Amino acid sequence: MLTCFKAYDIRGKLGEELNEDIAWRIGRAYGEFLKPKTIVLGGDVRLTSETLKLALAKGLQDAGVDVLDIGMSGTEEIYFATFHLGVDGGIEVTASHNPMDYNGMKLVREGARPISGDTGLRDVQRLAEANDFPPVDETKRGRYQQINLRDAYVDHLFGYINVKNLTPLKLVINSGNGAAGPVVDAIEARFKALGAPVELIKVHNTPDGNFPNGIPNPLLPECRDDTRNAVIKHGADMGIAFDGDFDRCFLFDEKGQFIEGYYIVGLLAEAFLEKNPGAKIIHDPRLSWNTVDVVTAAGTPVMSKTGHAFIKERMRKEDAIYGGEMSAHHYFRDFAYCDTGMIPWLLVAELVCLKGKTLGELVRDRMAAFPASGEINSKLAHPVEAINRVEQHFSRDAGGGSHRWHQHDLCRLAALTCASSNTEPVVRLNVESRGDVPLMEEKTKLILELLNK
């Protein structure tokens, strides 16, 4: 059994869970199951990504698949390459923000559609585990070619903004020594070539699989100091930080204050609806009051289950122009409904210039109107029992109602879920209120006490 196969992707500890042999088997299984003619491959900066990618390529070639290798890349560059070239699929070797001794893969088929549990991943897993493939036919073996799509990708990114709208901006960008660095360099060069008055202050921009400044995961408060400090030191207008494969971007205002992804969803939704009144916007259920309030004014909010596969599927079904999750995943119809970490900050930078306001000013009223706890993770030995304690407490208060308490619309437990981390279960808590910070903080504190009782 291959334990590296998860619900939506492949992730495992290097060695027993994921190695070159397993990578070859995954490539062979992908080829045998989908029978693609050509697919694109890429890999992040991790020290094992290149060898795993080449083993994956060999498996694909042995299955008769032509492989186009775009080199070191972010996950969204694989999405872009897949739909831009019109090939049959793509695979990115990445462990994103997982620990150093992990790696993984994200798989898509034609049109950059995700391959997850119920859309082919279990089939690939079954074939890889069986490891019973027909002999390699050397006359039909696939070809391998290295290609460079960076310029075409940057062209696409710049299609989302009008550079003429940009006024003088100073932006701190922290690539976290991940795969974003070369893309940031290419964007900087494009700004200069177009005469845009944008200065980029680059932090930890050099790709380094040793991650000398720690695994880049700005969702964690302890990973935000370098970006915050650089914004303050340089008097920047905004800070941007990426995770390892830059499919998420995290924003900081002009004071170095981290802006929860939840409010960026509302900000981007509002920007899209100004240009596309009546459009549909997809959001996840964890925190939603602000997003629904913004979208209802000019469009149609549509709630989706949390998770990239669900969001993308719902966006296609609804023909939604944009979708956002509070976890800093942002999805765009014109990006094949995929998530990208580069497009959001470009749009927000343009918005700051168009509105003549700072990022802090753009989100301040929304943060005051709908204060939220942000997602709080608690690693607990007995998570199910802990969640039951919370449910029982509030069902008593509500006379037997569910733990999505306080239907009086002042405050709600937006989400309380149990998820698996790499080592132990984690309970994720989100609380939001309508304009009442003390109430939100009081309920958050109470729930955390109940969880840890």
UniProtKB/Swiss-Prot annotation:
It is an enzyme of class 5 (isomerase). Transmembrane segments: none annotated. It holds the Pfam family PGM_PMM_I. Pathway: Nucleotide-sugar biosynthesis; GDP-alpha-D-mannose biosynthesis; alpha-D-mannose 1-phosphate from D-fructose 6-phosphate: step 2/2; Bacterial outer membrane biogenesis; LPS O-antigen biosynthesis. GO terms for molecular function: magnesium ion binding; phosphomannomutase activity. Its EC number is 5.4.2.8. Binds 1 Mg(2+) ion per subunit. InterPro entries: A-D-PHexomutase_a/b/a-I (IPR005844), A-D-PHexomutase_a/b/a-I/II/III (IPR016055), A-D-PHexomutase_a/b/a-II (IPR005845), A-D-PHexomutase_a/b/a-III (IPR005846), A-D-PHexomutase_C_sf (IPR036900), A-D-PHexomutase_CS (IPR016066), Alpha-D-phosphohexomutase_SF (IPR005841). The keyword Metal-binding applies. This is Phosphomannomutase. It comes from Escherichia coli. The gene is manB.
